[in-house]
C-alpha cells in the first residue's frame, strides 16, 4: 500500500496557517516552512500586489523599485486581473489599511 502525504491540497495548508495564527504560532510555522529566499520572494510578491493596486507606478518602475524582473510583475498583474472586483477590494483593504487617525 502506497502512503499518502498528510497535506495534499492547498486548502489544508491554508487551514494549517489559520490554526497557527489562532495559536500565535504563525511566525514559527512560516519561518520553518520557507527558506530565507522564499520569504524574501513572498515579501516582494506582497509589495508587487500592493503597488499594482495603488496604480501609481508602471510595471517597469515597480520592477526597478523592488529589484525583480518585469516578468514577475506581469505574473502578479495577470493574477490580479483574474480576480473579481470584490476580491480586489478585499486585497486592497488588507494591503492598504486606512491611515491611523491617532494624533
UniProtKB/Swiss-Prot annotation:
Coiled coil: none annotated. Residues 79-103 are annotated as: Disordered. One of its GO terms (biological process) is negative regulation of DNA-templated transcription. It is found in: Cytoplasm. One of its GO terms (molecular function) is DNA-binding transcription factor activity. Gene3D superfamilies: TrpR-like (1.10.1270.10). Residues 79-89 have a biased composition (Basic and acidic residues). Homodimer. This is Trp operon repressor homolog. The gene is trpR.
